[in-house]
Amino acid sequence: MQDISNHTPMIQQYLKIKSQYQDILLFYRMGDFYELFFDDAKKAAELLDITLTARGKSNGESIPMAGVPYHAAEAYIAKIVKKGLSIAICEQTGDPNTSKGPVERQVTRIITPATVSEEAFLDNNQDSILVSIFEKNNKYYLAYTSYTQGKIYLVKTLTSLNELKNTVLKLSPQEIITNSRELAQQNPFKKPIKALEEWYYSNFEAKKYINDSLDTNIANNILNLYKNDQLTTIGSILSYLTNILKDTPRHITDISYEQEQDTLNIDINSRINLELDNNSKSSLLSIIGKCKTSLGSRLLKRYFSNPTRNLNILATRHSIINSLGENQHFLKIQDVLSYISDIERIISRVALGTVKPKDLVALRYSLEQLPILKKLLSEKNTPEITNINNRIHQLDELVTLLDKAIIENPPTTIRDGGVIKEGFDKELDELKSIKDNSYDFLIKFEELQKQKIGISTLKVGYNRVHGYYIELSKQHADKIPTEYVRRQTLKASERYITEELKNFEDKVLSSKEKALAREKLIYDTLLKKVIEYYKQIQETAASIAEIDVLANFAERAIKLKLSQPKFNNLAKLELKEVRHLAIEHNIDEPFIPNDTLLSKDTNTLQIITGPNMGGKSTYMRQVAQLIFLAYIGSFVPASYADICDIDTIYTRIGASDDISSGRSTFMVEMTETAYILNNASAKSLVIMDEIGRGTSTFDGLALAKACAEKFAQMGAFTLFATHYFELTELAKQYPNVCNIHFEAKEYKDNIYFMHKAVTGAAKKSYGIQVAKLAGISQDVLESAKQNLYNLEKKQQLTESTQVQAQFQLEPTTQNPLQQKLDAIDINTITPLEALNILFELKKR
């Protein structure tokens, strides 16, 4: 640590504390402000757009300083946290009246992007995720927690950086911790990440934190169930949270393992290509996600992150959707749900000590809705709905307690009192009555003093510095009684105190302090009582979230004309009248649906041709989106859907340069294609759009043909859009390949897209007509037409050899020299025979 002896005692104290929190901003409490110094001040001034000032000197230079008011700090902290930065809150813990030197201060809380619980810091519709990555022997062990949900999830061991990246980005965490400094430095996730000290990833420490943090039975089960490296990863989260909270994270009550074989996997590029859950208005989530509660919105996002292939779970969801859809029963349920607040996060704030009085009012009001909700659910007496209803706890005792204890519109904090209802605590009421009745005393006291000394202008008042006083004009100085003691001199008047008024002041101020202390004690006791219901409220919140999502699915099914999908084990994907929801939502004219059939018995690969804007990409995307919706338990945009087991969806759609990594468009395309080829299986759905565009015609055609053949050979369900008409010949070579195309009609030099998939190969690309629609000038179009005519004429002259060269990509006959060389057996030939052959070849 640097020499700080030349600084003032206060700055010395600051630097000592700051040395323990070098990588985060230190909010240092000074009176009614949080102050920041040195580099922290510069950074805060820039981030928060606040004034940068100075205080004192350091090495002859002014010390930068910036500050925010204590009462408004929450808004400033929220801005910092949302930028991915962390903050240490340093409070005054000593008594200024008894302190020698600077008032004692210590960090009471650390706020990081993933460990906040206050409403102002959180996105209500998104989980706050903390990910821990333990790297060991080229393997990645990953665990994560949704902080306010009170659970830790363990993910399967990952064996590649690409697999790790996909897993992390799918979770979209607010914060990542790791033992790998190299990984933190590279940060392939582009998320807030920090490398922690080694002890956080010590197996010994991990087991200690598991035992200290979790219920004994849960801890024993975890220690027996998981391997050491998995325990290390779980323990790293618990130790990190303990350090952040300055307390044991007792709100963590569950550890679970995510079974990959139960989920439909979609890599991050495919998620982006399919516009599943980004923030745009055209995303699938924006169309499907109309939940009434924050609880439901977050659960739906979890469904989007981990679509399930468990058919029992899907059957349960579909059964509930059907039940809630009968007579639009979901409308009554959604009406009740709209009055329910985020009780999951409220009870977490209670456990973490960050709850506000208004949260308790919101909790009470939400719990009051539960009897109504339970009654509505009981009207649909199915086993699936009854199971959810049984996990919604009707907490009447807690409702009564909160109703009696907290006023209807409490202040923001308990700090200044005024939270506890009159009649809840007799002692508090008595203390408050002293202050409340003080006005009557002062009126009577003032009137008595006026009569006593005969001065009608006498008045009794109060200020925070000098307390209660009797004020008289200086012209009445000769009438001042001897019992009046001067308290303050003003320009035109004097202020006095009497023994009676001083006794009253002591009583009132004492009662106010005692009332605040009593109210704080009652409030803390109330929170301890509320936390006894923690597990019941968490279970209730989870059940409300589930019924909210399924009621939302029921409403969407009717509103968007969705149908219930079927599942088969026949390796067949049969879809009728499929629609693309986002496009249908955003166009005025009717959307034209299409059928899709993929089957091991007929075709697993469709070569799709047709003009740009004809509907090829929409057709492929809508199939992938339909499969995705089926596996989150929603109904689907088709009149009929019979779906087989799909374990992964891969897409290769569009591309652009990756300038930051020095990769061209073609390199990006080939990298993504290689990933799909190396990982796809017979249970995959593969979407390939225009492979080979970024290179020469022959190279592109060769690569596209090879890729298509590979998918045909592996039997993956593949939709393969291309402008290489030569690929349509594959249907003659492979029985599981078929051609479909999207038609267009020409009329008077104009093109009209039918958007309908038709069996067979397209005969034209209509590129010039599409260029006309795009606004290309007429002279360029005429030149293009002439060029096209010349090229087609040339093509006709050499069609047989040209097509053969493009399509076969190898010589039709072998060179005689090559034949002779291939016939030589180098394992049996003698040196003399080799020389004779060489002599013979040279003569040729």
From Swiss-Prot:
Belongs to the DNA mismatch repair MutS family. GO terms for cellular component: cytosol. This is DNA mismatch repair protein MutS. This protein is involved in the repair of mismatches in DNA. It is possible that it carries out the mismatch recognition step. This protein has a weak ATPase activity. GO terms for molecular function: ATP binding; ATP-dependent DNA damage sensor activity; damaged DNA binding; mismatched DNA binding. Gene3D superfamilies: 1.10.1420.10, DNA repair protein MutS, domain I (3.40.1170.10), MutS, connector domain (3.30.420.110), P-loop containing nucleotide triphosphate hydrolases (3.40.50.300). ATP binds at G610, P611, N612, M613, G614, G615, K616, S617. One of its GO terms (biological process) is mismatch repair. SUPFAM superfamilies: DNA repair protein MutS, domain I (SSF55271), DNA repair protein MutS, domain II (SSF53150), DNA repair protein MutS, domain III (SSF48334), P-loop containing nucleoside triphosphate hydrolases (SSF52540). The keyword Cell inner membrane does not apply. PANTHER family: DNA MISMATCH REPAIR PROTEIN MSH1, MITOCHONDRIAL, DNA MISMATCH REPAIR PROTEIN MUTS FAMILY MEMBER. Pfam families: MutS_I (PF01624), MutS_II (PF05188), MutS_III (PF05192), MutS_IV (PF05190), MutS_V (PF00488). Keywords: ATP-binding, DNA damage, DNA repair, DNA-binding, Nucleotide-binding.
